[in-house]
Amino acid sequence: MAAADVAYAPPMKSGKIGFESSQEVQHRIRITLSSKSVKNLEKVCGDLVKGAKDKSLKVKGPVRMPTKVLHITTRKSPCGEGTNTWDRFEMRVHKRVIDLVSSADVVKQITSITIEPGVEVEVTISDQ
């Protein structure tokens, strides 16, 4: 009868104790690239994705965002006299987004590549 009164507890798994603290904290990293030159932008995107895949990271992208087209229309004549002739200028801003899942130290190594002139890089790090 004494054996029936003993409460049964399942054995603890020793492999799980302290497992979370020994692993590096994983972050979601979003790298946003923007440029007026598509050629330079695609080169930097390719270098970033290649570097991330070499380190066997989880990569999503590059995602092509809509191109922003900025228009400016001005008169050619500085004095306002004469025929109304107009100049039309436009600037196209191309944007790419790359998402990674890794630790912050690894991202520093990946983003240390040479960035082409005219390419703006924005890195956003958030917890997963």
From Swiss-Prot:
PROSITE patterns: RIBOSOMAL_S10. It comes from Oryza sativa subsp. japonica (Rice). The gene is RPS20. One of its GO terms (biological process) is translation. This is Small ribosomal subunit protein uS10. Keywords: Ribonucleoprotein, Ribosomal protein. GO terms for molecular function: RNA binding; structural constituent of ribosome. It comes from the Eukaryota. The keyword GTP-binding does not apply. SMART domains: Ribosomal_S10 (SM01403). NCBIfam families: uS10_euk_arch. Belongs to the universal ribosomal protein uS10 family.
